[in-house]
Amino acid sequence: MDNSTQKDQHSGKKYSRKANKVQKGFTAAYPTQSSIPYKYQPLIIPESEKKGFNSQAKRFYHKQDDIPGPGFYNVIHQSPVFDSVSLSKKGTCTFPSMCARLDTIVSKFPAANAYTIPSRLVSKKDFSNSCSSMFQLPSYEKVLKFETPAPNQYNASDSCCKQANNVCARAGFVSKTQRGLFTVSKTGPAPGHYDVNESLVKQSPKILMSCFKSKTDRGLKLTSTGPGPGYYNPNGHPKVQKKTLIPRNPILNFSAQPLPLPPKPPLPGPGQYEIVDYTGPRKHFISSASFVSNTRRWTAGPSQPGMPGPATYRPEFPGKQSFLYNEDNKWIPVL
């Protein structure tokens, strides 16, 4: 009795443990089978078959329903560093590198919240609320103020330009011409609307003339005292005038004294001579044989009566004729 009761109690404890404790599956892309029964029975594929040739792609996945199970989305892949026994720790290439892969990067600088900025370094004016600092004046530069007045902020006085006393040195010959603005009378005539009296020089013409008129005479030709064109020959020799020699002792002659030769006529001026064409008429170049024939060309023979003239008839060459039947159904041989 005691043994049976102890077995029952012991067996009851075992049953109670299995009944009260619920197995929790691994929450990943491929959830394991849970202890709670449900409608669909999934197929369990071992993990060794899913890993093939260092690939992390999903293989041998069989989906039974359209409803995603727990852990079906937000998949977290495994680490690229494999700890499998089948893979070499030194790599799979020909010359593996001994350097460690995927080292943890440790920053050499402190984090943003690891230090505090002193208050004296913080700018009193925050430019981030308005515009960028590159479009504003620098805060550390002092703006220079102009101490001189503007062009319209003072009245110029003429007292500094005038002479203050008579003690200072002055020039010996001081000009008495007044300086300043030239007052133009409004009633005077405009330039060119009055005549200048030039009666002292010459009589002024009654036309509109300029106020500043030149007194140089225009249109006057000076009489030349030298010879004109063609009056002398620059290539000739100067002429020596021959005087008539009258003998002092006259001799009894039966003839008069010889007279000198008449002078040569002057050279002709422009337009007094005719231009002679010494080149002759222009030659007409015609083709001729080396031995020119004396036979007459274009000789028209005597016309014979009854002969037709040129272009009175039109000779025609007989064409090829066929052996087909004509209108008379006769054979026509080829000539």
Swiss-Prot record:
Q: Which residues carry this modification: Phosphotyrosine?
A: Y73
GO CC annotation terms, alphabetical: mitochondrion; nucleus
Family stated for the protein in its record: Belongs to the STPG1 family.
One Pfam family name is SHIPPO-rpt
> What the protein does?
May positively contribute to the induction of apoptosis triggered by O(6)-methylguanine.
Q: Where do Basic and acidic residues bias regions lie?
A: 1-11
Q: Where in the cell is it found?
A: Cytoplasm; Nucleus
Q: Which UniProt keywords apply?
A: Apoptosis, Cytoplasm, Nucleus, Phosphoprotein, Repeat
Q: Where are the STPGR repeats?
A: 68-75, 110-118, 149-156, 188-215, 226-255, 267-284, 308-317
- Gene Ontology biological process: positive regulation of apoptotic process; positive regulation of mitochondrial membrane permeability involved in apoptotic process
Segments of this protein annotated with the region Disordered: 1-20
Q: From the record, give the cysteines joined by S-S bonds.
A: none
Stated name of the protein: O(6)-methylguanine-induced apoptosis 2
